[in-house]
């Protein structure tokens, strides 16, 4: 348990993780954990497979992390939303990524509702950063902007608001 706990502490000290993400990483076999690059000894030429991690021990480590407030899905969701929105992603993509990371749907919805991000303004900034201050007006170029913003995870209404505000 001590090895698993120290692994969890190391992972959580680097960044926040969701419970499902931490559980998956703890259950995974460490890839050549003791090996160093360039130091090949005769005994390390054929690494021995390690025994699978006991799920009960993982549960104990997860409970210990919750007990010490090291693991918190709500905090993870808030920080993840802030991080991804600063990188220019929209709410739809962030929601999808959080679901893939194992964050509960209701928790994701609540975190997105609590964040104070103006997604229309965010979409406008992303479009201007990619296509310049003068957004295209012809249909073909507008479609290119729209596809790009949809890929980045913005909703259709947010994209249309850019052109409504741009026209005024």
Curated annotation (Swiss-Prot):
GO terms for biological process: regulation of DNA repair. The keyword Cytoplasm applies. GO terms for cellular component: cytoplasm. Keywords: Cytoplasm. It is found in: Cytoplasm. InterPro entries: RecX_HTH_1st, RecX_HTH_2nd, RecX_HTH_3rd, Regulatory_RecX, WH-like_DNA-bd_sf. Its main location: cytoplasm. NCBIfam families: PRK00117.1-3. Modulates RecA activity. Belongs to the RecX family. This is Regulatory protein RecX. It comes from Serratia proteamaculans (strain 568).
